[in-house]
Amino acid sequence: MPLTIANILTLLRVALIPVVVAVYLIGGSGYLTAGLFLLAGVTDWADGYLARKRNEQSAFGAFLDPVADKLMVSAVLVLLAADPEMTQRVLSPVLFTIVVAIIIGREITISALREWMAELGNRGVVAVGWLGKIKTTLQFLAITVLLFAQAGMQAPALILGELLLYAAGALTLWSMMAYLKGAWPMLSER
């Protein structure tokens, strides 16, 4: 593993996961939880930018970056969906939980698909593209707004966060279909 600034930022994002979860669960400051999650989102942008700008792209970074995103997003979505204080305040607790399940299910499905395509020597078919990057950005934005809204329990921000999450869920499904469509020729041969 090359120890580049970009890879260090990605590792920092992974290290932030248990910190964000712990702060949330011990009932620490909601603003601290939201701020730490926002920091993780900034490292997601910064690691990619720096890797390209400094010509420090690596196989390790290409592997770990999306894994770090999926772990952070999934961990916090589980916290939010399992928190009665959150689910009692959203417009539709059932839809909220379904969208969380869709997002996490897609992340697992596409991770497995990438692994399988790599086994077949076709990893490029499911490489992270612009749609996946927009999806991840929207997920981070939605969750950040939800965390800040929950910290202050401000209804307009909570509604905005929920609507952003639904948009992220739709984009998540769209990106999954795009990846599956790209991999379908290889899948149908097996």
Regions found by a protein language model. Give the residues of each.
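Short hydrophobic/aromatic, small-residue-rich stretches within specific transmembrane helices
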Residues: 33-41
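Conserved hydrophobic/amphipathic secondary-structure segments
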Residues: 56
